[in-house]
């Protein structure tokens, strides 16, 4: 008689179902904030960052990396995050600061401003990516954190929504580049606007793609988005 196979005692791999609060729980009993930025890649406009402290008992459903969500889903989640979060804040670094510091340090500055603006001080921050920014509290970096941590996912949504609104406003102030549609990223209308109008006050003039577009050396269908990615 064949014996039935024994049940495996090996731990089962985690089944991915989207972001959860496991990373937050692993940080211990203190306040944990998620931190993420938006706008490292575009050729124009500020870089934004958000810091969010979530109540584990009131986590909005549907949180995910902001880039994976529709504009409608992000707008709904932004409202809910702001309603239920223990604390949240969005920080910005200007085009002048980006040009002076470089985009990576400007993103870190925006993160500092977001954390400093929280109504309560976090004990630790979960930061998307692998770069160890100098922030106002201890940090833990999380690669692809906006797909793993609800707090980071919430921060990614707030940062993107805040920056997108700014770029819509910039489109009205600086028409002809299509900022409202592409939010400062590479697009045919953006390249053509640079060729026809020259740079606006919010363009990142030190960036190679902007220089190439202004010199007429970047095709409108080129796949080059930025110098750094992100």
UniProtKB/Swiss-Prot annotation:
Q: Where in the cell is it found?
A: Cytoplasm
> Which terms are listed as keywords in the entry?
Cytoplasm, Endonuclease, Hydrolase, Manganese, Metal-binding, Nuclease
Q: What is its EC number?
A: 3.1.26.4
Q: How is the cofactor bound?
A: Manganese or magnesium. Binds 1 divalent metal ion per monomer in the absence of substrate. May bind a second metal ion after substrate binding.
Q: Outline the extent of the RNase H type-2 domain.
A: 30-219
Q: Name one GO biological process term.
A: DNA replication, removal of RNA primer
Taxonomically, which superkingdom? Bacteria
Keyword Metal-binding assigned to the entry: answer is yes
Q: Name one Pfam family in it.
A: RNase_HII
Cofactor(s) essential for the protein: Mn(2+); Mg(2+)
Query: Where is it found, in Gene Ontology cellular component terms?
Result: cytoplasm; ribonuclease H2 complex
- InterPro entries in the record, alphabetically? RNase_HII, RNase_HII/HIII, RNase_HII/HIII_dom, RNaseH-like_sf, RNaseH_sf
Q: Enumerate the residues binding a divalent metal cation.
A: 36-37, 128
The text of the family note is: Belongs to the RNase HII family.
PANTHER family this protein is in? RIBONUCLEASE H2 SUBUNIT A, RIBONUCLEASE HII
Q: Which function does this protein serve?
A: Endonuclease that specifically degrades the RNA of RNA-DNA hybrids.
Can you name this protein?
A: Ribonuclease HII
The gene behind this protein is rnhB
């Amino acid at each position: 008689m064949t014996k039935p196979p024994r049940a495996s005692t090996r731990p089962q791999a985690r089944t991915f179902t989207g972001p959860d609060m496991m990373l937050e729980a692993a940080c211990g009993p203190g306040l944990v904030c998620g931190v993420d930025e938006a706008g490292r890649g575009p050729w124009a406009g500020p870089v934004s960052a958000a810091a969010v402290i979530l109540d584990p008992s009131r986590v909005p459903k549907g949180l995910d990396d902001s880039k994976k969500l529709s504009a409608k889903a992000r707008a709904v989640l932004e409202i809910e995050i702001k309603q239920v979060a223990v604390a949240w804040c969005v920080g910005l670094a200007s085009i002048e600061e980006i040009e002076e510091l470089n985009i990576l340090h400007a993103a870190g500055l925006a993160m500092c401003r977001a954390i400093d603006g929280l109504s309560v001080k976090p004990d630790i921050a979960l930061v998307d990516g692998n770069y160890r920014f100098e922030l106002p509290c201890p940090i833990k970096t999380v690669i692809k954190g906006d797909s793993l941590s609800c707090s980071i996912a919430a921060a990614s949504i707030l940062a993107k929504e805040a920056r997108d609104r700014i770029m819509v406003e910039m489109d009205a102030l600086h028409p002809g580049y299509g900022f409202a549609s592409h939010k400062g990223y590479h697009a045919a209308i953006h390249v053509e606007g640079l060729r026809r109008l020259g740079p606006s006050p919010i363009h990142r003039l030190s960036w190679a793609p902007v220089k190439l577009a202004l010199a007429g050396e970047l095709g409108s269908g080129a796949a080059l988005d930025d110098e750094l990615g992100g």
